[in-house]
Amino acid sequence: MLDNKDIATPSRTRALLDKYGFNFKKSLGQNFLIDVNIINNIIDASDIDAQTGVIEIGPGMGSLTEQLARHAKRVLAFEIDQRLIPVLNDTLSPYDNVTVINEDILKANIKEAVENHLQDCEKIMVVANLPYYITTPILLNLMQQDIPIDGYVVMMQKEVGERLNAEVGSKAYGSLSIVVQYYTETSKVLTVPKSVFMPPPNVDSIVVKLMQRTEPLVTVDNEEAFFKLAKAAFAQRRKTINNNYQNYFKDGKQHKEVILQWLEQAGIDPRRRGETLSIQDFAKLYEEKKKFPQLEN
């Protein structure tokens, strides 16, 4: 039987909406979870214990936050919508281990906030129902900063989650797969139906688990340049890497032979498409490119 105090039920969420006269903002991608079973699955996948610090993005009315607070040492939640701050102050009042920061996660000084609020935690996890319209920027922003995050269990649009977790050669595999898998080991936790949200989103959802690698999957001396090179191979998915790189490099059309030579030395067939290349293949291309100063972009 569900605790009738749980926020993640249709009746309690509706009561809070009425109490605070809250209207959803489509521009902020607000879809509140109203199913405790889904939340419990997220908590279980997160392996949270009494020594874990949690970063949550977009707590909404606190349906996931309250469950995190019951399991974790501390919860640091970022909420962009000022209208939700009094609601969260109300719903989370029983918990003294939760800090809510009213800021845009993409503009916040996350490193400083972690140092101030989660410094005594042995492990840090990001656990969140992410705003779907900025899922990718949020994840890349967190992964590419010097923040001691051990892993992520996050809900997102199903299509985006499948891209993060995609295998080489699959339709969903692309530059986003490469960046995320460079930093983390990815796995699917569960698919989530539209019916467990208020209001229901227009798309299906998925929960994915991303655990930080102790070392990146490949070693490169400039991650930004490496990711740009990989992304260029997917510029036009139906074209070969040879064609895509001719369009990518400055004066690429004049350096057709150089591009072919570069691909050959890296052991990559120029007729292949970007989605057939592994992260290791792109690392070979990146290293070999250093021998060809003509290839600028």
Curated annotation (Swiss-Prot):
Catalyzed reactions: adenosine(1518)/adenosine(1519) in 16S rRNA + 4 S-adenosyl-L-methionine = N(6)-dimethyladenosine(1518)/N(6)-dimethyladenosine(1519) in 16S rRNA + 4 S-adenosyl-L-homocysteine + 4 H(+)
Q: Provide the organism lineage as a comma list.
A: Bacteria, Bacillati, Bacillota, Bacilli, Bacillales
Which GO annotations describe the biological process of this protein?
rRNA methylation
The name this protein goes by in its record: Ribosomal RNA small subunit methyltransferase A
Which residues participate in S-adenosyl-L-methionine binding? N31, L33, G58, E79, D104, N129
Q: What is its EC number?
A: 2.1.1.182
| Any one Gene Ontology cellular component term annotated for this protein | cytosol
Write down the species: Staphylococcus aureus (strain NCTC 8325 / PS 47)
Purpose: Specifically dimethylates two adjacent adenosines (A1518 and A1519) in the loop of a conserved hairpin near the 3'-end of 16S rRNA in the 30S particle. May play a critical role in biogenesis of 30S subunits.
| Chief location bin | cytoplasm
Q: Extract the SUPFAM superfamilies matched here.
A: S-adenosyl-L-methionine-dependent methyltransferases
Localization, per the record, is: Cytoplasm
Recorded hits in PANTHER family, A to Z, give: DIMETHYLADENOSINE TRANSFERASE, DIMETHYLADENOSINE TRANSFERASE-RELATED
Q: Does the keyword S-adenosyl-L-methionine apply?
A: yes
Task: Recite the UniProt keywords alphabetically.
Answer: Cytoplasm, Methyltransferase, RNA-binding, rRNA processing, S-adenosyl-L-methionine, Transferase
Under the heading CDD domains, the entry gives: AdoMet_MTases
- Supply the InterPro entries for this chain: KsgA/Erm, rRNA_Ade_diMease-like_C, rRNA_Ade_Mease_Trfase_CS, rRNA_Ade_methylase_Trfase_N, rRNA_adenine_dimethylase, SAM-dependent_MTases_sf
* Recorded GO MF terms: 16S rRNA (adenine(1518)-N(6)/adenine(1519)-N(6))-dimethyltransferase activity; RNA binding; rRNA (adenine-N6,N6-)-dimethyltransferase activity
Which family would the database say this protein is a member of?
Answer: Belongs to the class I-like SAM-binding methyltransferase superfamily. rRNA adenine N(6)-methyltransferase family. RsmA subfamily.
